[in-house]
Amino acid sequence: MSDKISFLPPEPIQLLDEDSTEPELDIDSQQENEGPISASNSNDSTSHSNDCGATITRTRPRRSSSINANFSFQKAHVSDCTIVNGDHGTKFAVWRITVFLEPNLKAFAAKRESYKIQTYKRYSDFVRLRENLLTRIKTAKPEKLNCLQIPHLPPSVQWYSSWKYQEVNLNKDWLAKRQRGLEYFLNHIILNSSLVEMTKDILIQFLEPSKRVA
């Protein structure tokens, strides 16, 4: 983060239902702008998949993307945000990112432990991630591009609302919509095995565990 920041007391804004253990991905509202993702129904869930190794399901992803020999990405959860004080009286939201991993080796799977990565990111970090991904896939062969589509991020504050930027950007409803959009974006990326294979170093750097600044 470019700003010198200090975290407020740990009282995250509650945007999700505490009773929900599995985050519901807001897929339907995104499909129109996100390329060829087809939907298929099963008995207990609604699944959206494509031919590029990505499957995003409302209850649980059916596939995972290998990040190394030991683990594959299983799903990402963008949860509570904390409002942070920046310089010059500014405030911004920092999101808690949890990425669950699925062990590839029986030795890890037998332990029945929950493997996950947790980090903290702000919206601008997602913007840089998307820019880096777009730059990387430009080097791909033309026939591969259909499998390397990068979804859009939830929108930033519109120019005509910039005069009240802080009020809009920290509004609870606005943050709830942004949370769903960021979660959709990240799951779309990490569950696309072709995209993960090509951008593995970028994703690993993005998911480096963060240290809170006192």
From Swiss-Prot:
UniProt main location, coarse: membrane
Name of protein: Endosomal/vacuolar adapter protein YPT35
Chain segments carrying region Disordered: 1-63
Protein topology in the membrane: Peripheral membrane protein
Biased composition (Acidic residues): 16-31
GO molecular function, one term: protein-macromolecule adaptor activity
Family to which the UniProt record says this protein belongs: Belongs to the YPT35 family.
Domain PX: start-end pairs: 73-213
One Gene Ontology biological process: protein localization to membrane
Keywords per UniProt: Endosome, Membrane, Phosphoprotein, Vacuole
Cell compartment(s), UniProt: Endosome membrane; Vacuole membrane
Signal peptide annotation: none
Quaternary data: Interacts (via PxP motif) with VPS13 (via SHR-BD domain). Interacts with RBD2. Interacts with YIF1. Interacts with YIP1. Interacts with YIP4.
Motif (PxP): 5-15
Disruption phenotype: Decreases VPS13 levels at endosomal membranes and nuclear envelope-vacuole contact sites.
Pfam families: PX
Record field: compositional bias (Low complexity): 38-58
Effect after changing residue 5 to A: Disrupts interaction with VPS13
Modified residues (Phosphoserine): 65-66
Physiological role: Recruits the lipid transfer protein VPS13 to endosomal and vacuolar membranes.
GO cellular component: endosome; endosome membrane; nucleus-vacuole junction; vacuolar membrane
Domain notes: The PX domain binds phosphatidylinositol 3-phosphate (PtdIns(3)P) which is necessary for peripheral membrane localization.
Record's keyword annotation contains Phosphoprotein: yes
